[in-house]
């Protein structure tokens, strides 16, 4: 009788721990389930509606939770990233060992720098005049 009580108590502790863990990592778990669902759909030849240029990006890992290309984008006429940008972002991901979001940010900051713009979006040119929002 006493061992049954401890078994039930252990079960509740494990269940509560799992619930707390799921609440803490809900976005990561949701992303994993979304990716798993996509893989299952692809495995059973279920069609995922993607713009053709986004399909290649998905296969190459050029997506994230913040840059979701799996969601409804079949009517999106934009072409996504050009091939040169994709290759540069992939190189940043591999060389700096960062995820897609960070690589995209680094790529944009470098492009800003090449065009005379600071990483925060303000012009580097000392002659430039900006209005303060105070």
From Swiss-Prot:
Belongs to the UPF0357 family. The keyword Kinase does not apply. It comes from the Eukaryota. There is a cross-link at residue 86 (Glycyl lysine isopeptide (Lys-Gly) (interchain with G-Cter in ubiquitin)). Disulfide bonds: none annotated. Residues 1-23 form the signal peptide. It comes from Saccharomyces cerevisiae (strain ATCC 204508 / S288c) (Baker's yeast). The modification Phosphoserine is found at residues 71, 74. Keywords: Isopeptide bond, Phosphoprotein, Signal, Ubl conjugation. This is UPF0357 protein YCL012C. The keyword Ubl conjugation applies.
